[in-house]
Amino acid sequence: MRALKRQETRFETAPLRSFYQGKRVLVTGAAGSVGSALCLQLAELGCAQLAMLDQFDHGLLEILEQVHRANPRLDALDALCDVRDRERLQAWMNQIAPDVVIHAAALKHVHLGERHPVECVLTNLVGVRNT
């Protein structure tokens, strides 16, 4: 997969399959470039459920459809939520009860972070604490 526009690296997936087999996995930032690539990889690794959380509704629908195409039997669900909203995030965590959380939600563009430092801190620092 070339989702990140970098040279693809091949690696042994058996240990990953063994780890994720039968687990409920939650990915925050699922609609982003890193989060969506992770979701597509997780769809192939045998997890019991893949919950994809993001505040970007259109992107969340897109990755949900892509995951369904990649693995129609996977119990995949969308969670529309902002990681900065602690109460809503906790409600989703309680509902999903994940075995594994992969936190990929972030504002990653440095120039935007410099122009919007409050938003960057709220998402990148408070979001991590909330997760």
Predicted features, each with a name:
Residues M1-A97:
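N-terminal Rossmann/SDR dinucleotide-binding element
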Residues G35, V110-H111:
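Glycine/Thr-rich phosphate-binding loops of Rossmann-like dinucleotide-binding domains
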Residues Q49-F56, N94-I96, V100, R115-T131:
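NAD(P)-cofactor binding segment of oxidoreductase domains
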Residues D78, H109, P117:
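Generic anion/oxyanion-binding catalytic loop in active/binding sites
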Residues A104-K108:
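Conserved NAD(P)H cofactor-binding loop of Rossmann-fold oxidoreductase domains
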